[in-house]
């Protein structure tokens, strides 16, 4: 079985960026997703251009910060995206507004000089029933995989692919993670593990309710014990190059 450890939130804060880089250089992270238009975007880009082996996708934003397009249908009265707690309740999104914003974020990413490996989203926003079909079309337009959280089924990528958000908060630990991966190994060819390694900085503490746990994630993801266990159980660490383009391909 192959595993993608994808670090979310690249570009959120400098501490997040530095944590992701350490998890890449000293650990198991080979893939990350960038939040464009966020405070540490340029810092992330500078780091990324020094790390040719780190594959970088786009972490689409619909619940954090301001839209690049200024689309009022996507925001509250202050011009920021609808808060996470209200986002999932809304059913009045305009398809054109969603599409234009997603395209704007992809184009912004490409203008940064980065190679787009795949798409996913902050708070899994792309699985919202109104956003899901639109973001799927955007992924097809740019010929990149889209993180699958049950939207298209287990074989959406032409292989037995599975996304897991198990590695989070109260479930953090080497033993629980390995037990989970070994259970999945019996059923899947490729598993994506969502992770959020970071060094906590003041901005992260201000903007995220999930902060201190990120340093524990970083410790685990750079653990020699974890790396040794993955090797011992014939679990190969990979990135989104194993999914050439969604959904018409095989895991390679």
From Swiss-Prot:
Q: Which domain of life is it from?
A: Bacteria
Q: Which GO MF terms are attached to this record?
A: deacetylase activity; hydrolase activity, acting on carbon-nitrogen (but not peptide) bonds, in linear amides; metal ion binding
SUPFAM superfamilies, A to Z:
Glycoside hydrolase/deacetylase (SSF88713)
Could you say which EC number(s) this protein's record lists?
3.5.1.-
Against InterPro entries, the record matches this protein to: COD_ChbG_bac, Glyco_hydro/deAcase_b/a-brl, YdjC-like
Q: Name one Pfam family in it.
A: YdjC
Q: Which UniProt keywords apply?
A: Carbohydrate metabolism, Hydrolase, Magnesium, Metal-binding
Record's family? Belongs to the YdjC deacetylase family.
Reported function: Probably catalyzes the deacetylation of acetylated carbohydrates an important step in the degradation of oligosaccharides.
What quaternary structure, including any partners, is listed in this protein's UniProt entry? Homodimer.
Q: Which PANTHER family match?
A: CARBOHYDRATE DEACETYLASE (PTHR31609:SF1), YDJC DEACETYLASE FAMILY MEMBER (PTHR31609)
- From the Swiss-Prot or TrEMBL record, give the protein name: Carbohydrate deacetylase
* Organism the protein comes from: Vibrio cholerae serotype O1 (strain ATCC 39541 / Classical Ogawa 395 / O395)
The coenzyme or cofactor needed here is:
Mg(2+)
Q: Cite the binding residues for Mg(2+).
A: 59, 122
Q: Which GO terms describe its biological process?
A: polysaccharide catabolic process
The UniProt entry, under Gene3D superfamilies, shows: Glycoside hydrolase/deacetylase
């Amino acid at each position: 079985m192959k595993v993608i450890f994808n670090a979310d939130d690249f570009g959120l804060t400098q501490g997040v960026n530095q944590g992701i880089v350490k998890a890449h250089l000293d650990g198991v992270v080979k893939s990350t997703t960038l939040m464009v238009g966020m405070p540490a975007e340029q810092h992330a880009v500078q780091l990324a251009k020094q790390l040719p082996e780190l594959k970088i996708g786009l972490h689409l934003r619909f619940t954090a910060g301001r839209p690049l397009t200024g689309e009022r249908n996507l925001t509250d009265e202050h011009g920021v995206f609808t808060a996470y707690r209200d986002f999932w309740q809304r059913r009045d999104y305009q398809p054109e507004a969603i599409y234009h914003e997603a395209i704007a974020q992809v184009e912004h990413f490409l203008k940064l000089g980065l190679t787009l490996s795949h798409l996913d989203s902050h708070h899994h926003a792309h699985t919202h029933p109104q956003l899901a079909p639109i973001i799927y079309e955007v992924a097809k337009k740019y010929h990149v995989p889209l993180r699958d959280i049950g939207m298209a089924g287990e074989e959406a990528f032409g292989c037995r692919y599975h996304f897991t958000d198990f590695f989070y908060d109260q479930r953090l630990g080497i033993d629980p993670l390995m037990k989970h991966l070994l259970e999945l190994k019996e059923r899947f060819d490729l598993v994506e593990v969502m992770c959020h390694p970071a060094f906590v900085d003041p901005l992260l503490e201000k903007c995220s309710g999930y902060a201190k746990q990120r340093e524990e994630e970083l410790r685990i993801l750079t653990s020699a014990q974890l790396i040794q266990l993955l090797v011992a159980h014939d679990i190969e660490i990979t990135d989104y190059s194993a999914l050439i383009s969604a959904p018409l391909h095989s895991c390679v």
